[in-house]
Structures are given as C-alpha cells and as structure tokens.
C-alpha cells in the first residue's frame, strides 16, 4: 500500500474522532444550537457556542456517524443546504457578538440528491463562501478526516486552514476524479497520487497553514496540541486590525 493509499484509508476510517468529539474535548461548556430557521435541522452539520479557555467561540463541524444508525441520522456526513444555512446562521451570530469561529471538516462532499438541489444546494454553498470571505471575526478551519469538494470548502474559507496528518483535502473524491478522467472509479488510488490530496503536499503548496501530527485517533496529545495552537493563533488573529485580517484572508485565497 502506498503512502497516499494509506492516508486515504485512514482519512475515511469510521473510528476517527468526530466534530462532536473535538467540541467536547477541546472546549468547555459546549452548547449545541439547532436549525437554519428556514427549513430544517440538518444532523450532518453540528454547531454551537463554547469557551476556549476563557474566550467565547462558535464551533461548527460536519458530523459523520460511528455506526450505521448514526450515519443514517447524519446522512453519512454529507450536508444538505439547510446544514450550510445553519452553519451560516451561527457564523453571522458569531460576528454579531464578536466570537471567533472554529470549524471541523470531515465530508466526502455536499449531498447531491434531487431534494438538496431543489432547495438550493449550490446557492447555500456559494453564499457561505461569500459570507465567510468577509466575516468580521477570526476563522480557523481544521480538516479532521475527508475534505471533499465544495462541501468542505463551504466551511473552510478561513484565516488559517489546518489538517491532521492522515487526512485529505481535494476538489472531489479520488473515485470521482478517476471516473471523469479514465471512466474507471476503481483507479481511485492512482488518481489520489495525481491529485496531491495529503497534508504534506498541500502544506508545501501553501494551501494549508499547519499540519497536526497524529499518534492515534483518540490521543489526548492531539486534542491538547490543537487546543494550544487554537489559543495561540486566535490571540494573534484578534490582535490584528479588522481591515488587515480581512485583506489577508482575501489574499490567502486569491493566490490560488
């Protein structure tokens, strides 16, 4: 098994810590909030308010299940438009009250069903991209498993994007890439080699800003490491003038 194939397998491992795991272990007094106030509450996106040390923050994540029943309730971590609208509602609330936003991303992509398209999946993702680019509070996005397509990017227009060591981030799944390029989804590993989806490759290209080493899926060292980095980075981001913060975020994505 090649290194990329191993990372692809580990990124999708059902045993990985979820967004709610990180929310409960890194933050204090996490309180989940529900609903987009327009249509429904999408279980594949979770979010709420919490404390990071003494700093109030908004935490948002894409939630996969740990078993079949949970995955069905979470739609296998594939958000509907109401999930992205819930995330945006929480981000605008964070902006109103001056809370930094931290997102945890683990999705193969946004749900491509007919109903999701009818309810404006593309619009919901595009609006998140637009609003996050100008959100007037610090944003840090962390890839904790799969970071697939626009479904991941809709929570990743951030001042800093981090990846755990054995995760992936790509414009689409390797299977989708192989199906388009060679009409053969079984060549996913070969596609992954070409796509440069690993944390090391993306860090080298400047797409991400930090790699979090992994020593096991439930390692207390990982949680503590992320917490300390978050405290340090948010302190630095909050010290910047708002105009500088937003300009650097804009330039970060323009360079691609």
Swiss-Prot record:
Keywords annotated in UniProt: ATP-binding, Cytoplasm, Fatty acid biosynthesis, Fatty acid metabolism, Lipid biosynthesis, Lipid metabolism, Nucleotide-binding, Transferase
Q: What is its EC number?
A: 2.1.3.15
Pathway, per record? Lipid metabolism; malonyl-CoA biosynthesis; malonyl-CoA from acetyl-CoA: step 1/1
Where does it primarily localize?
Answer: cytoplasm
Top-rank taxon: Bacteria
The protein's matches in Pfam families, at most eight in alphabetical order, are given as:
ACCA
Q: Which Gene3D superfamilies match?
A: 2-enoyl-CoA Hydratase, Chain A, domain 1
**InterPro entries, from UniProt?**
Acetyl_CoA_COase_a_su, ClpP/crotonase-like_dom_sf, COA_CT_C
Q: Does Lipid biosynthesis show up as a keyword for this record?
A: yes
Query: Can you name one GO molecular function term for this protein?
Result: acetyl-CoA carboxylase activity
| One record GO biological process | fatty acid biosynthetic process
Tell me the compartments it is located in: Cytoplasm
Q: How does it assemble?
A: Acetyl-CoA carboxylase is a heterohexamer composed of biotin carboxyl carrier protein (AccB), biotin carboxylase (AccC) and two subunits each of ACCase subunit alpha (AccA) and ACCase subunit beta (AccD).
Its function? Component of the acetyl coenzyme A carboxylase (ACC) complex. First, biotin carboxylase catalyzes the carboxylation of biotin on its carrier protein (BCCP) and then the CO(2) group is transferred by the carboxyltransferase to acetyl-CoA to form malonyl-CoA.
Protein name from the UniProt record: Acetyl-coenzyme A carboxylase carboxyl transferase subunit alpha
Species: Streptococcus equi subsp. zooepidemicus (strain H70)
The gene name reads accA
């Amino acid at each position: 098994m090649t290194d990329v194939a191993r990372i692809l397998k580990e990124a999708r491992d059902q045993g990985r810590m979820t967004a709610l795991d990180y929310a409960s272990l890194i933050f204090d007094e996490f309180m989940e909030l529900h609903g987009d106030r327009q249509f429904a509450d999408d279980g594949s996106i979770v979010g709420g308010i919490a404390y990071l040390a003494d700093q109030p923050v908004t935490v948002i994540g894409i939630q996969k299940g740990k078993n079949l029943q949970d995955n069905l309730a979470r739609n296998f971590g594939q958000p509907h438009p109401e999930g992205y609208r819930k995330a945006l509602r929480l981000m605008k609330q964070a902006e109103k009250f001056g809370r930094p936003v931290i997102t945890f991303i683990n999705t193969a992509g946004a749900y491509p069903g007919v109903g999701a398209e009818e309810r404006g999946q593309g619009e919901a993702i595009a609006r998140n991209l637009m609003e996050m680019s100008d959100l007037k509070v610090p944003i840090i996005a962390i890839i904790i498993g799969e970071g697939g397509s626009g479904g991941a990017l809709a929570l990743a227009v951030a001042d800093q994007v981090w990846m755990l060591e054995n995760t992936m981030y790509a414009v689409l799944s390797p299977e989708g890439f192989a199906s388009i390029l060679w009409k053969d989804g079984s060549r996913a590993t070969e596609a992954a080699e070409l796509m440069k989806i690993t944390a090391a490759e993306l860090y080298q290209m400047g797409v991400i800003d930090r790699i979090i080493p992994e020593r096991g899926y439930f390692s207390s060292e990982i949680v503590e490491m992320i917490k300390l980095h978050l405290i340090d980075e948010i302190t630095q981001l909050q010290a910047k003038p708002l105009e500088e913060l937003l300009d650097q975020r804009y330039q970060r994505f323009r360079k691609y």
